[in-house]
């Protein structure tokens, strides 16, 4: 008797399932020795990891490229964002996912750290924007600017240093070949990390201090000028010309030039139509900066 259509579908599905199981087993027998030898498969989805920092348990997204490890790696530091969950018009996880493939295709592992109060670490403390607005409402603008500097030097820098320590001990990562990159407030943090850890191979700051901090706070200017002066790593400074201000990158580059320290300054044509668009060029215009940034990273980070 002929099988019913339902039975045929079930049989076909069952056969396909057995085939998938055999394929998975076969791939498993291949993958295990490859992983043992340090060969990994490129990740289409990130691994969500937890990074301890004092009493905090920060979340981060980690991608690794395909091929033979250990890999050079990038620790990326986001800015303060438009709110606790968003940056550049995207959720923070979407923003991380937009950047990761750019780094993976150049052979770099990519760790996107969520600091307290933001993104996947929103439950680990207050959002920095709320903290600074409250300080300004209670004590005034000058007090808020000073608090931002204090947090930059202490709590938030500690979090990034914890992320760096985590990355250095992660399987498949070459602890000797790590770059630190940051955007906006995260760009400031990247410069302070370069001052703190002489083993960082390179630093890239996108739009660091461009959102009013440079003009409004002499303390921030002094802190960042001292940081680039003390940093051992080569530094790249990147902005779009329609950012709020390009003075931070130009002034920091002038200081590096005065000190005869290796650096690269790139001011690109306008991105989008507004200062917000220009400020978020790291996310909105990856094709604009990709070639220059990876030429810099490949020179200073990739070599063993």
Residue ranges, per PLM feature:
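N-terminal cap/lid segment of alpha/beta-hydrolase-fold proteins
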Residues: 41-68
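Short substrate-entry loop that stabilizes the transition state in hydrolases
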Residues: 69-71, 80-122, 212-213, 245-246
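Alpha/beta-hydrolase active-site loop
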Residues: 128-170
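Primarily recognizes the serine-hydrolase "nucleophile elbow" in alpha/beta-hydrolase
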Residues: 152-224
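C-terminal catalytic histidine-bearing segment of alpha/beta-hydrolase fold enzymes
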Residues: 262-304
């Amino acid at each position: 008797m002929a099988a019913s259509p339902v039975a045929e579908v079930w049989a076909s599905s069952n056969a396909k399932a057995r085939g998938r199981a055999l394929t998975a087993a076969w791939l498993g027998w291949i993958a295990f020795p490859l992983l043992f030898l340090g060969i990994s498969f490129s990740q289409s989805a990130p691994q969500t990891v937890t990074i301890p920092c004092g009493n905090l348990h920060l979340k981060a997204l980690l991608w690794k490229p395909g091929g033979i490890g250990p890999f050079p790696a990038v620790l990326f530091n986001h800015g303060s964002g438009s709110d606790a969950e968003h940056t550049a018009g995207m959720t923070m996880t979407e923003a991380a996912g937009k950047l990761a493939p750019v780094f993976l295709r150049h052979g770099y592992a990519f760790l996107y750290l969520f600091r307290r109060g933001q993104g996947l670490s929103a439950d680990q403390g207050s959002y920095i924007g709320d903290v600074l607005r409250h300080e300004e409402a209670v004590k005034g603008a000058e007090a808020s600017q000073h608090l931002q500097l204090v947090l930059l030097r202490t709590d938030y820098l500690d979090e990034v240093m914890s992320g760096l320590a985590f990355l250095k001990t992660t399987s498949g990562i070459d602890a000797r070949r790590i770059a630190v990159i940051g955007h906006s407030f995260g760009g400031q943090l990247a410069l302070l990390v370069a001052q703190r850890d002489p083993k960082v191979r390179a630093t890239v700051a996108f739009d660091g201090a461009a959102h009013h901090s440079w003009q409004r706070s002499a303390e921030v200017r002094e802190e960042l000028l001292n940081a680039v002066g003390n940093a051992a790593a080569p530094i790249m400074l990147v902005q779009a010309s329609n950012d709020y201000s390009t003075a931070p990158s130009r002034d920091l580059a002038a200081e590096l030039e005065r000190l005869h320290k290796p650096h690269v300054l790139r001011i690109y044509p306008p991105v989008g139509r507004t200062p917000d668009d220009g400020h978020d060029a790291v996310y909105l215009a990856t094709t604009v900066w990709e070639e220059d940034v990876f030429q810099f990273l490949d020179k200073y980070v990739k070599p063993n």
